[in-house]
């Protein structure tokens, strides 16, 4: 969807500061006006942010919330607070009432035009009735039919939206189902939405934080704040107040973030919408929606149709007045012409075509909330994509290992058939032992039958990767750990940057202890004095330090997270069995260790992403990565998936290659650019726009979700149609601002899904590209359907024009037109939605919404004045043939209308002198209606065949590839036969049986249409860019 620029937004910008702490910045963005109430509300939000719970002592907290840090709240007080504050849940944005949704389906551009047409029919019926000139009820039937079409297609569109809403509602998983709470000294579990401020709660690894919580005690607690910052690095939570800002201190855990490991106990200080994330979620409501590109196209088309209808109607109203008709009669002509010009079947065609594409997308894991968003995807020229989980698998995986002075590629498949190193190596065994034992991650129980890569693990991303790799290589990592009981442990922290544990050995005859350590490679190496090479401990001299440094830089340059591992056997004399190891006193060595090797990990790209990015590139779509991750990692992933193409260099790459300072490099020489959040923060909007214009390949790293909004706005300033992916609550403003917001179905928050136009059920970037392809295809096919639908407007209109100007008996009635529009032609026009692409549409550039219109001048001119004109000649040839064979030669028909319609005249003579009563003349008139109807249908068969392609020959596309179209043509012919020859039709719908030869008259005209269009296409293919191409290619 396109989004309006008129909003005022108070934002909380979150990022990552030194030491992994969260930083916050409050700012107000303004684009256009904002109401006083909204401004006041935002100011109130700002005041509410000024909390001091993190700075209060435990006793002050107890007093403030009338609670106990050991026994929790009293149950009676908790019940009162629940009544006062309401449930602990994010209040969903105020939904649109169902009746409003349905009313919208009835009040679009085409719908309004059809309502007007129905009103005109009713007025015409009333005028005829008042004059006593009511020989048929055609206008009344037509009005009822038009209203029925609007209502039925409205119901269809509403049902599609309702069905998508139900799918989206099934994702309600942001709030945890259960929380462990202590009240009146008793510990029990309750639904998380029943928590109130002052509740004493407990969390453990694997739980979602159930509210904003002030930490009172913690043991190795780490949380994932990625829904706030976009960064997946775990954040430590502890009881100490480390910063005056509540958003930066470590003693506050935020609602809906994930507790990765460890345990914690704390007091609830905010619930529901009063939590930090609740306030951020409500800010997205400041961004308003506006029309989608397809809605603009349909409005443009309706303007053209309405303008032409009124022009033709007014012209012939004047002509009718000039040649002597009464005002009321001329007004009836005006209304009839307007109604004849309205393509009544087009609304159903557009709705069904979009619905079919939405259904097709749903089968490919894309749920479309708004039917019009289907086409918007096809117009997309820029995709701003997350990295984690969208471009990558959101599963940290061991990638490389360095031991015995060699870098090895890790095999993470179940069968281990691709392993490139000797698993019997003593060094490998030592490294594997260290990475298995020095690891706090654990598999959830009951997953023995689940493949290792898909098992759920309690622990942070890095330890999960190591545990799964150990499970794949050792076979039973948890059992292996049990053979080396842990007796002491120092958890990882950001100061030491290492994790250490001490274990007893599995051999009961060996009473030594094994000390193992992992952490930042440089920190681990500085604690080592030897290195393990081919099973032997060698002194860690300068040569081995250089080898380590080379390997470390090589792996780090790949954008991978690198960890170092070392070990030390503690002799039994100094550390006998039962020795009391003390982590506070550190009564064991932490230096003089033996370095075992390096292991690097990365969140690998999804297998389908490189091809998807390549498709985007060939389709002229720019893919921009926007991530909270480190610039090196972001750049490496961008290069591996093709966002940064092979051979492209950044300014830093050029400077390194030329060995010159970065500021001396001409930035325009760099095709690629990596901008981090700090740089983005210092750039003004014009600088960002210039960077986007200068560098075709862009990566934004260490960005906050709020900065994503700035990036989207800058792309839109360049005239791009922007699609944005997001999963966090703080992504919702960018999702709403984008022309089409794409939320993640698995990892996405409810706020993101509410703000988005489309949801990826598999969180896969390749699904977006599928959506783009389907969007482009439906635009092409809608163009074909509209061209097919518009063509018959001319043969439906010209009978009225000839009727008024030449005064022949009316060749075609309103009810007959209705059957063409809503019965026989609706199926062929819808069948074009199933047409395959003429060529690889993903090799074309995105359409320019200002230049490449759904209905352009060549389409209108070709449909109306060329193919439509041929159909009109066919209709009149058949009409005059039928009249002549019954005794009414063409010259006699001219000026015959007044006598023909005089129901008092019962002896009107034909060209042979035969006398006709009014009833006989009416029977012949209905026969002419049927003949003209059949003529249009025969020509429309040729028309639907030529509409299969706009450039290629139909022979190249294939006549029978689209089986739905073949069935539709057969159905069209069967309907025509049924209407002509079914008993009772003359009395019900004014259709008459006709002679066989009258079916044959329009066939040469149908052949002419086919040959004429093949010549047009040949010229378009042979002379690209010529006058012929510009004027005749639609």
Swiss-Prot record:
Phenotype caused by lack of the gene: Mutant mice are born at the expected Mendelian rate. They develop achlorhydria, hypergastrinemia and ciliated metaplasia. The parietal cell viability or chief cell differentiation are normal when compared to wild-type littermates. Mutant parietal cells have abnormal morphology characterized by dilated canaliculi with few microvilli, spherical vesicles rather than normal tubulovesicles and enlarged mitochondria filled with concentric cristae.
The entry's keywords: ATP-binding, Cell membrane, Hydrogen ion transport, Ion transport, Magnesium, Membrane, Metal-binding, Nucleotide-binding, Phosphoprotein, Potassium, Potassium transport, Translocase, Transmembrane, Transmembrane helix, Transport
GO terms for MF: ATP binding; ATP hydrolysis activity; magnesium ion binding; P-type potassium:proton transporter activity; potassium ion binding
Basic residues bias (residue ranges): 26-39
Chain positions found as Phosphotyrosine: 7, 10
Transmembrane segments: 98-118, 142-162, 299-318, 331-348, 783-802, 813-833, 854-876, 929-948, 963-981, 997-1017
GO biological process: pH reduction; potassium ion transmembrane transport; regulation of proton transport; response to xenobiotic stimulus
Tissue occurrence: Expressed in parietal cells (at protein level).
Membrane topology category: Multi-pass membrane protein
Cross-referenced InterPro entries: ATPase_P-typ_cation-transptr_C (IPR006068), ATPase_P-typ_cation-transptr_N (IPR004014), ATPase_P-typ_cyto_dom_N (IPR023299), ATPase_P-typ_H/K-transp_N (IPR015127), ATPase_P-typ_P_site (IPR018303), ATPase_P-typ_TM_dom_sf (IPR023298), ATPase_P-typ_transduc_dom_A_sf (IPR008250), Cation_transp_ATPase_P-type (IPR050510)
Keyword Secreted: no
Compartment annotation: Apical cell membrane
Binding locations of K(+): 339-340, 342, 344, 796, 821
Location of region: Disordered: 14-41
Cellular component terms per the entry's GO annotation: apical plasma membrane; plasma membrane; potassium:proton exchanging ATPase complex
Cytoplasmic membrane side: 1-97, 163-298, 349-782, 834-853, 949-962, 1018-1034
Described purpose of this protein according to its UniProt entry: The catalytic subunit of the gastric H(+)/K(+) ATPase pump which transports H(+) ions in exchange for K(+) ions across the apical membrane of parietal cells. Uses ATP as an energy source to pump H(+) ions to the gastric lumen while transporting K(+) ion from the lumen into the cell. Remarkably generates a million-fold proton gradient across the gastric parietal cell membrane, acidifying the gastric juice down to pH 1.
Family affiliation: Belongs to the cation transport ATPase (P-type) (TC 3.A.3) family. Type IIC subfamily.
Subunit description: The gastric H(+)/K(+) ATPase pump is composed of the catalytic alpha subunit ATP4A and the regulatory beta subunit ATP4B. Interacts (via the P-domain) with ATP4B (via N-terminus); this interaction stabilizes the lumenal-open E2 conformation state and prevents the reverse reaction of the transport cycle.
PANTHER family: POTASSIUM-TRANSPORTING ATPASE ALPHA CHAIN 1, SODIUM/POTASSIUM-TRANSPORTING ATPASE SUBUNIT ALPHA
Name of the protein in question: Potassium-transporting ATPase alpha chain 1
Organism expressing this protein natively: Mus musculus (Mouse)
Taxonomic lineage of the native organism: Eukaryota, Metazoa, Chordata, Craniata, Vertebrata
């Amino acid at each position: 969807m396109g989004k309006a620029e008129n909003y005022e937004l108070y934002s909380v910008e979150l990022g990552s500061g030194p030491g992994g702490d969260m930083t916050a910045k409050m700012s107000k963005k303004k684009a256009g006006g904002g109401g006083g109430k909204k401004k006041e509300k935002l100011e109130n939000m700002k005041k509410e942010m000024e909390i001091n719970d993190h700075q209060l002592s435990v006793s002050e907290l107890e007093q403030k919330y009338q609670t106990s840090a050991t026994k929790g709240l009293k149950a009676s007080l908790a019940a009162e607070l629940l009544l006062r504050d309401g449930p602990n849940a994010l209040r969903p944005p105020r939904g649109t009432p169902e009746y409003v949704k349905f009313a919208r389906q009835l009040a679009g551009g085409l719908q309004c035009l059809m309502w007007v047409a129905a009103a005109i029919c009713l007025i015409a019926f009333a005028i005829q009735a008042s004059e006593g000139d009511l020989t048929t009820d055609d206008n009344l039937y037509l009005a009822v039919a038009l209203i029925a079409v609007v209502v039925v297609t409205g119901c269809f569109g509403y049902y599609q939206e309702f069905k998508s809403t139900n799918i989206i509602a099934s994702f309600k998983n942001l709030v945890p189902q259960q929380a462990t709470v202590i009240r009146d000294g008793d510990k029990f579990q309750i639904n998380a939405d029943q928590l109130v401020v002052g509740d004493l709660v407990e969390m453990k690894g694997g739980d979602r934080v159930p509210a904003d919580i002030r930490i009172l005690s913690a043991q190795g607690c780490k949380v994932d704040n990625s829904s706030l910052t976009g960064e997946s690095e775990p954040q430590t939570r502890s009881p100490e107040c480390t910063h005056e800002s509540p958003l930066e201190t470590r003693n506050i855990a935020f609602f809906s973030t994930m507790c990765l490991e460890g345990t914690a106990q704390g007091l609830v200080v905010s619930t529901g919408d009063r939590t930090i994330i609740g306030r951020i979620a409500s800010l997205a409501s400041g961004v308003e929606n506006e029309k989608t590109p397809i809605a603009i196209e349909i409005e443009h088309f309706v303007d053209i149709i309405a303008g032409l209808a009124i022009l033709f109607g007014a012209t012939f109203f004047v002509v009718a007045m000039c040649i002597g008709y009464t005002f009321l009669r001329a007004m009836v002509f005006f209304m009839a012409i307007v109604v004849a010009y309205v393509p009544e079947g087009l609304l159903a065609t557009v709705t069904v075509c979009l619905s079919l594409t939405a259904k097709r997308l749903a089968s490919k894991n894309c749920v479309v909330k708004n039917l019009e968003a289907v086409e918007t995807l096809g117009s997309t020229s820029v995709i701003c994509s997350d990295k984690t989980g969208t471009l990558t698998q959101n599963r940290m995986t061991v990638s490389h290992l360095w031991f015995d002075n060699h870098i090895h590629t890790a095999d993470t498949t179940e069968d281990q058939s691709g392993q490139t190193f000797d698993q019997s190596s003593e060094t490998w065994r030592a490294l594997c032992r260290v990475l298995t034992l020095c690891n706090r991650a654990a598999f959830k129980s009951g997953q023995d039958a689940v493949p290792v890569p898909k098992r759920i693990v309690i622990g942070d991303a890095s330890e999960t990767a190591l545990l799964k790799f150990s499970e794949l290589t050792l076979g039973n990592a948890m059992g292996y750990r049990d053979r080396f009981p842990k007796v002491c442990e120092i958890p990882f922290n950001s100061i030491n940057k290492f994790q250490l544990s001490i274990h007893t050995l599995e051999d009961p005859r060996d009473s030594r202890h094994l000390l193992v350590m992992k952490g930042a490679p440089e920190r681990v190496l500085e604690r080592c004095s030897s290195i393990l090479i081919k099973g032997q401990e060698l002194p860690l001299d300068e040569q081995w330090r250089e080898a380590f440094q080379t390997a470390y830089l090589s792996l780090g340059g790949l954008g991978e997270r690198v960890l170092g591992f070392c070990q030390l056997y503690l002799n039994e004399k100094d550390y006998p069995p039962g020795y009391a190891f003390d982590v506070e006193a550190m009564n064991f060595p932490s230096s003089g260790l033996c370095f075992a090797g390096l292991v690097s990990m990365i969140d690998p790209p999804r297998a389908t992403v490189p091809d998807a990015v390549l498709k985007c590139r060939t389709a002229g779509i720019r893919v921009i990565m926007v991530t909270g991750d480190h610039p090196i990692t972001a750049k490496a992933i961008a290069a591996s998936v093709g966002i940064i193409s092979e051979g492209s260099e950044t300014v830093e790459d050029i400077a390194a290659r030329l060995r010159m300072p970065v500021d001396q490099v001409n930035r325009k020489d760099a095709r690629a650019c990596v901008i981090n959040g700090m740089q983005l923060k210092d750039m003004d909007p014009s600088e960002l726009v210039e960077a986007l214009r200068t560098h075709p390949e862009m990566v934004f790293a260490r960005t906050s979700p709020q900065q994503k909004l700035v990036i989207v706005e800058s792309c839109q300033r360049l005239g791009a149609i922007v699609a944005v992916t997001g999963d966090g609550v703080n992504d919702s403003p960018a999702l709403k601002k984008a022309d089409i917001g794409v939320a993640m179905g698995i990892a996405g928050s409810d706020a993101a899904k509410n703000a988005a136009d489309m949801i990826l059920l598999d969180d896969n970037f390749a699904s977006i590209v599928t959506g783009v392809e389907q969007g482009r295809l439906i635009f092409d096919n809608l163009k074909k359907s509209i061209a097919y639908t518009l063509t018959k407007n001319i043969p439906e209109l010209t009978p009225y024009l000839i009727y008024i100007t030449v005064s022949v008996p009316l060749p075609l009635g309103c009810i007959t037109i209705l059957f063409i529009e809503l019965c026989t032609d609706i199926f062929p026009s819808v069948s074009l939605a199933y047409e395959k692409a003429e060529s690889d549409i993903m090799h074309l550039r995105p359409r320019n919404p200002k230049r490449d219109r759904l209905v352009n001048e060549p389409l209108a001119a070709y449909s109306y004045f060329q193919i439509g004109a041929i159909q009109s000649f066919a209709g009149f040839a058949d009409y005059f043939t039928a009249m002549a064979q019954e005794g009414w030669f063409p010259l006699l028909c001219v000026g015959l209308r007044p006598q023909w319609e005089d129901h008092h005249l019962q002896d009107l003579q034909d060209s042979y002198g035969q006398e006709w009563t009014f009833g006989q003349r009416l029977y012949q008139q209905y026969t002419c209606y049927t003949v003209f109807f059949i003529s249009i249908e025969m020509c429309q068969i040729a028309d639907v065949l030529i509409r299969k392609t706009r450039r290629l020959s139909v022979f190249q596309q294939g006549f029978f590839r689209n089986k739905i179209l073949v069935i539709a043509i057969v159905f069209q012919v069967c309907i025509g036969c049924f209407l002509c020859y079914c008993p009772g039709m003359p009395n019900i719908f004014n259709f008459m049986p006709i002679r066989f030869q009258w079916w044959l008259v329009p066939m040469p005209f149908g052949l002419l249409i086919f040959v004429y269009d093949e010549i047009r296409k040949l010229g378009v293919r042979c002379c690209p860019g010529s006058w012929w191409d510009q004027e005749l290619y639609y």
